Amino acid sequence: MIGLDTNVVLRFVLQDDIGQSPRSTALFDSLSPQSPGYISIVTLAELAWVFDRTYRKPRNEIAVLLRGLLESNDLVLENHDAVAQALRRFDSSNADFSDCLIERLCASGGCSRTMTFDVGAAKSAGMVLL
């Protein structure tokens, strides 16, 4: 298994760098179920944030990207079930993916609720306003 940093995944998905994109594509092409790539929770959160804030991608494109990673047989995602649940909430709400992910990770860790000062996260991501 090979760990994949955010910038490697971005270069593969965006194909926007003449030097790095072909190298990331070659790496992704070499992945298989027997030798998968590993994507951490931090990488997923960074990907969603960069797509939203830097590239101004619409929510549906962010969801398609995340779903593609989640469903790939050549990738292992950290805490796959919590990521899938967070993506479902992201699809059905106005919450940021990071907020959905935080709430689902807390729930999978045994938390009865996740407290926040973020009014939007309390309304859309299932958190409780402190």
Report the location of each language-model feature.
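Short active-site oxyanion
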Residues: 34-37, 74, 110-113
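Short, well-structured N-terminal submotif of metal-dependent ribonuclease cores
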Residues: 1-39, 54-61, 67
